[in-house]
Swiss-Prot record:
Inhibited by 3-isobutyl-1-methylxanthine (IBMX). Residues 1-153, 756-793 are annotated as: Disordered. SMART domains: HDc (SM00471), REC (SM00448). The keyword Protease does not apply. GO terms for biological process: cAMP-mediated signaling; lateral pseudopodium retraction; phosphorelay signal transduction system; positive regulation of chemotaxis to cAMP by DIF-2; positive regulation of release of sequestered calcium ion into cytosol; regulation of protein localization to cell cortex; regulation of release of sequestered calcium ion into cytosol; response to osmotic stress. Phosphodiesterase specific for cAMP. Involved in the degradation of intracellular cAMP. Morphological suppressor of tagB. Phosphorelay protein that accepts phosphate from rdeA or supplies phosphate from regA; depending on the relative concentration of the phosphodonor proteins. InterPro entries: CheY-like_superfamily (IPR011006), HD/PDEase_dom (IPR003607), PDEase (IPR023088), PDEase_catalytic_dom (IPR002073), PDEase_catalytic_dom_sf (IPR036971), PDEase_CS (IPR023174), Sig_transdc_resp-reg_receiver (IPR001789). This is 3',5'-cyclic-nucleotide phosphodiesterase regA. The lineage of its organism: Eukaryota, Amoebozoa, Evosea, Eumycetozoa, Dictyostelia. Residues 410-733 form the PDEase domain.
Length: 793
């Protein structure tokens, strides 16, 4: 073994330079166009200049290429006594040496590898966010997918990219020359840490990792574990190498933790190729089989789908034939010409034998004839008769109206407002604290918003056309993202209904004007408009288009406010067109402040300011600043009101918001951003999140609410009971009787906690809630003021 090593050292020292690679396989930043890449490119100018110096020596290095290859063959023969291919082949490799003298090779290797790493402008993917209005925010960030080789071709070493990690310079060079002879594409790195950087952040994707076991910082086993634990890279096969005395133990450990194979140094050339080809050919073949099976399944699915479509088309043709036949008979009956009608009436008159007996009937028929002949649209009655026929389906009626009716307008193509009709009891229910928003669909909820506006006479006072109010509500609904678990239209309605309860059942309207209430209802509906499901912290860390647009300040709240007035600027949704200039300015100022007040980063500032005013000064309804403070307080209470709802509603909302939190922390981890601690599923639970939110955020706010609005004092007991329930869940989790993920499958969330808590006095709570819900404010009365506002008290 010593003789072998001496011969290797002698060969290496006799060669002062080695062939320069024809092309680098290390990641490059040439294609990057981001601001981050440009800055990194400027910082690494020196690195590029060093790379150019290496290129100047390329010609001299190539002159020695054949000699080096011949000498390398001799080295290989020392290990396995086998002959090698005499053909010199240039392959794409990434070297980790500057090819200087043998004495400085180790330091230069490390420097060049570090330069290669620094020269890569890695950019964790944050998909979407390419629009100032956040139109692409629903494209949630995901890690780059592993390169899938072209498995339609046969396996070939020239298609294989191998990453070699070894801290021994000599071993790296030997492996490099061995693998080059078999036409593999090779990237060399001096340690596991750099290898992981290349795998995880480099632009190059690898088909195999060949790593030494004993390396500083990150061992071969550590690198293997990281690859196996990663959702994207876990499919990369790993072969470990070692030359120590406990190889058999390393071999067993390699298989146990998911490695593909183990090699003992020194490695024979043919054995190395056989091991690599065995691993990769099996993967190649397996993926070809999977691809073939997937193709067969797709073809089978297409065949079944086509058969079903043919069957459906035959049924549609049969139904269409029946419909055409039916329509033919209907049209003959309905679409008769006016002259036919007149002729028939006259013929009936002529058949009368004695006109004197039918004088009244004759006058009636003649009057009908004159009316038909004098009509400006004498065909219209027949057309309307056809439209009203019950045998004509809605689609056909819509087609006839849109194509043949002179009253058709562009609005006929726009979706119509849901026409759900509610009785008086339902309209009273939305004033109650126990209103369950989850029992209604979005189409059911939208008409209730119109009722809220009408209850305060806002359409009459501010001249709001009902059609435009409906169009505004539908547009707001459309801009909320349906795939969000928490920040969706249901949440927006829930906040609006809560604030509506404050105004009516809790008598908060007495402190406000009609214009204040108008602004408050708009703000509640729009306060989370187009929310992407990721909070401001994520926007700033990811440097999304929205964070750049609003300079990292209340990013989402500014976005919600901007979209609100963008909708209101549309002529079909402009419910502010009846306001004068002063009213519009005041409403806009108020709406912007209200939506910005929902930014939780400013929560304690708003809360403390309100508490200080409440403790020291009475609120003056004539002061605009006092009314705005009340408005901000009401929308903030509404925004987090789910903690004061009955237990089953608080439970459902808490699950939904924690789902969004956990989703954000998951993507923060993948993208390498700082993980928000209270959202990290590995460090907290749903019950812990809910309990902490009650303790530190919601409870102080609703204590002020109870002092400000006496009718709301019973909410403190509801909050206390909810807090006890969450505490019970935390204790059950500590005892191992309840798993955090099990909470989302519970039909009755009170079952588990009953064993830990005294029975809830449901009757007492129900009486208190119903007594508060039954009280509502009297209709608002109009009073004139300097700016044409009306009082809401």
């Amino acid at each position: 073994m010593n003789n072998k090593q001496e011969e290797i050292d002698q060969f290496l020292s006799s060669t002062s330079t080695s062939p320069s690679p024809s092309s680098s396989s290390s990641p490059s930043n040439n294609d990057s166009t981001s601001l981050k890449s440009m800055i990194s490119g400027i910082e690494n100018l020196n690195v590029h200049s060093k790379g150019n110096d290496n290129k100047n020596n390329n010609n001299n290095n190539n002159n020695n290429n054949s000699n080096n290859n011949e000498k390398q063959k001799d080295i290989v023969s020392l290990e396995n006594n086998s002959s090698s291919n005499n053909t010199t082949t240039t392959t794409t490799t990434t070297t980790t040496s500057n090819h200087n003298s043998n004495n400085n090779s180790n330091n230069n290797n490390n420097n060049i590898n570090n330069n290669n790493i620094n020269n890569n402008n890695y950019e964790p993917l944050v998909n979407g966010h390419n629009n100032g209005f956040g139109d692409k925010l629903n494209d949630q960030p995901s890690p780059s997918s592993h390169r899938v080789s072209d498995f339609s071709d046969e396996y070939s070493p020239s298609k294989v990219r191998i990453l070699v990690a070894d801290d021994d310079d000599v071993q790296r060079k030997i492996l490099n020359n061995l693998l080059k002879k078999f036409h593999y594409n090779v990237t060399l790195v001096p340690n596991g840490e750099i290898a992981w950087e290349y795998i995880n952040k480099g632009q190059q994707k690898y088909d195999l990792v060949l790593t030494d076991v004993m390396m500083p910082h990150i061992t071969g086993f550590d690198l293997l574990q990281r690859i196996n634990d990663h959702p994207v890279h876990r499919h990369i096969p790993v072969i470990l190498m070692s030359g120590t005395a406990v190889d058999y133990k390393y071999a067993n450990d390699t298989i146990k933790i998911g490695g593909q194979d183990f090699l003992t140094k020194p490695i024979a050339k043919e054995l190395l190729k056989k091991k690599i080809d065995t691993v990769l050919q099996s993967i190649w073949q397996r993926r070809k089989e999977e691809e073939y099976k997937a193709t067969l399944a797709q073809e089978r699915e297409k065949g079944n789908k086509l058969a079903k479509e043919m069957e459906l088309k035959e049924h549609e043709i049969e139904e269409l034939t029946k419909k055409v036949s039916k329509m033919s008979s209907i049209s003959k009956e309905a679409m008769e010409s006016p002259l036919v009608s007149v002729t028939r009436n006259i013929e009936e008159l002529l058949k009368q034998s004695s006109w004197s007996h039918y004088e009244s009937e004759i006058k009636e028929k003649l009057s009908s004839i004159l009316k038909e002949l004098g009509s400006s649209n004498i065909y219209r009655p027949s057309f309307e008769k056809l439209i009203k026929n019950d045998s004509v389906d809605p689609v056909t009626k819509s087609f006839l109206v849109s194509e043949f009716s002179s009253t058709t307008s562009r609005r006929n193509s726009i979706p119509t407002f849901p026409q759900t009709t509610y009785n008086r009891d339902t309209k009273e229910v939305i004033k109650g604290w126990e209103f369950d928003v989850f029992k209604y669909s979005e189409d059911d909820l939208m008409p209730l918003l119109v009722d809220m506006f009408e209850n305060f006479q806002l359409p009459e006072i501010f001249k709001i056309p009902i059609e435009k109010l409906q169009r505004f509500i539908m547009t707001v609904n459309a801009l909320y993202r349906k795939n969000n678990r928490y920040h969706n239209f249901t949440h927006a309605f829930d906040v609006t209904q809560t604030v509506y309860t404050f105004l009516t059942s809790f008598n908060a309207a007495q402190y406000l004007t009609h214009l204040d209430i108008f602004a408050l209802l708009i703000s509640c509906m729009c306060h989370d408009l187009n929310h992407p499901g990721f909070n401001n912290t994520f926007q700033v860390n990811a440097q999304t288009e929205l964070s750049l647009e609003y300079n990292d300040i209340s990013v989402l709240e500014n976005h919600h406010a901007m979209l609100t007035f963008k909708i209101l600027r549309n002529s079909e949704c402009n419910i502010l067109e009846g306001l004068n200039e002063d009213q519009y300015k005041e409403l806009r100022r108020s709406v912007v402040q209200l939506i910005l007040a929902t930014d939780m980063q400013n929560h304690f500032e708003h809360t403390n300011k309100f508490q200080h005013h409440l403790n020291n000064l009475p609120f003056d309804r004539n002061k605009k600043e006092d009314r705005q403070m009340i408005l901000n307080f009401l929308i903030k209470c509404g925004d987090i009101s789910n903690i004061a709802r009955p237990w089953h509603l608080n439970f459902e909302w808490s699950l939904r918001v924690s789902d969004e939190f956990f989703q954000q922390s998951h993507y923060e981890t993948i993208c390498g951003y700082p993980v928000t601690p209270f959202m990290d599923k590995t460090k907290t639970t749903r019950a812990r999140i809910a309990a902490d939110f009650i303790d530190f955020v919601a409870s102080p706010l609703f204590q002020s609410m109870a002092k400000f609005l006496k009718e709301s004092q019973f909410l403190l007991k509801v909050i206390s009971k909810n807090r006890e329930n969450w505490q019970a869940y935390m204790e059950l989790q500590k005892e191992g009787k309840c798993n955090d993920d099990d909470l989302q499958f519970m039909e009755d969330p009170t079952i588990l906690v009953k064993s830990k808590l005294p029975k809830i006095d449901e009757e007492e709570n129900r009486d208190k809630v119903s007594s508060s819900s039954s009280s509502s404010t009297a209709p608002l009365t109009s009073t004139s003021s300097s700016n044409n506002e009306t009082s809401s008290s």
